[in-house]
């Protein structure tokens, strides 16, 4: 339990940041799923549209330190190659 005023404040900030970061990670995962579902349905145009939005969200998550840059690059590369294969 936080005892000093500064440690209580840091605990509040950590909870707030954790909630915000969780929301961003959830949005990224949602758009990855949207691209995957569009690929499974064979809808190349929808997959491409969702992919461009997903790229932006992944890059933002990388800049905020939520996702490692290599993980984001790997996801983008694999999904893009699947879109091209359609």
UniProtKB/Swiss-Prot annotation:
Q: Where is the signal peptide?
A: none
Q: Which region ranges are annotated with the description Disordered?
A: 1-25
Q: Name one GO cellular component term.
A: small ribosomal subunit
Residue ranges under compositional bias (Basic residues)? Answer: 7-25
**Which Gene Ontology BP terms does the record give?**
translation
Which Pfam families did the record assign? Ribosomal_S20p
* GO molecular function list: small ribosomal subunit rRNA binding; structural constituent of ribosome
Q: Enumerate the InterPro entries for this protein.
A: Ribosomal_bS20, Ribosomal_bS20_sf
Superkingdom assignment = Bacteria
Keyword check for Ribosomal protein: yes
Recite the UniProt keywords alphabetically: Ribonucleoprotein, Ribosomal protein, RNA-binding, rRNA-binding
Q: Which Gene3D superfamilies match?
A: Ribosomal protein S20
NCBIfam families in the record, alphabetically?
S20 (TIGR00029)
Q: Which PANTHER family does this UniProt record tie to the protein?
A: 30S RIBOSOMAL PROTEIN S20 (PTHR33398), SMALL RIBOSOMAL SUBUNIT PROTEIN BS20C (PTHR33398:SF1)
What is known about what this protein does? Binds directly to 16S ribosomal RNA.
Q: Per the similarity annotation, which family is this?
A: Belongs to the bacterial ribosomal protein bS20 family.
This protein is called what?
Small ribosomal subunit protein bS20
Biological source species: Vesicomyosocius okutanii subsp. Calyptogena okutanii (strain HA)
Q: Which gene encodes it?
A: rpsT
């Amino acid at each position: 339990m936080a005892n000093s005023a500064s440690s209580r404040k840091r605990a509040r900030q950590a909870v707030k940041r954790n909630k915000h970061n969780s929301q961003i990670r959830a949005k990224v995962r949602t758009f990855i799923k949207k691209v995957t579902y569009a690929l499974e349905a064979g809808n190349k145009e929808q997959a491409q549209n969702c992919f461009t939005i997903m790229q932006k969200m992944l890059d933002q998550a990388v800049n905020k330190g939520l996702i490692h840059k290599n993980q984001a690059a790997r996801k983008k590369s694999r999904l893009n190659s699947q879109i091209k294969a359609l």
